[in-house]
From Swiss-Prot:
One of its GO terms (molecular function) is tRNA binding. The keyword Cell cycle does not apply. It holds the Pfam family Ribosomal_L16. The keyword Electron transport does not apply. This is Large ribosomal subunit protein uL16. Belongs to the universal ribosomal protein uL16 family. Gene3D superfamilies: Ribosomal protein L10e/L16 (3.90.1170.10). Binds 23S rRNA and is also seen to make contacts with the A and possibly P site tRNAs. One of its GO terms (biological process) is translation. Part of the 50S ribosomal subunit. Keywords: Ribonucleoprotein, Ribosomal protein, RNA-binding, rRNA-binding, tRNA-binding. Residues 1-20 are annotated as: Disordered.
Amino acid sequence: MLMPKRTKYRKQQKGRNRGKAYRGSTLAFGTYGLKAVELGRINSRQIEAGRVALSRTMKRTGKIWIRVFPDKPLTAKPVGVRMGKGKGSVEEWVMNIKPGRIIFEITGVNNETAVRALTLAAAKLPFKTKIVSMESENELY
C-alpha cells in the first residue's frame, strides 16, 4: 500500500479538485503513458491494480514508472455512529487527479503491447484516460 511514511498532521480538510494539471502533464521517463482526461481521485489500491495489470501484460519486459503518489488522507466515521464527536479516523490515502496528469509511463515494449497494457491499466482507474506517446503528445488510440 502506498502511503506517506510520516506527515506533519494526521488529518486534512477535504478541499476542492478544480482546474487542469500543468505539472506532471508531459512524459518524462517513458515512451508511452496514460494521461487523465477528467477530474478524479486515485487511491493506493487502484494504483497497485494498474501496476499489476501493466507488469503482467508486459511480461516483465520494459520498465514502468508510477507518476502519482497518494499523499492525502481520507477520513470516515464507522457505520452506525451518530454525527458529531469529532472527525473520523483515516480510512485510506488518495491523490486528487486533474485532467492532463500522467499516471503511468512505460518503455521498452513495442507499440501493440504498450497499447494493450495501458488499456488494461486504464480499466482499473475511476476516471477517463487516454494513451499518449513520446512522438505525439496527443492521444494515440
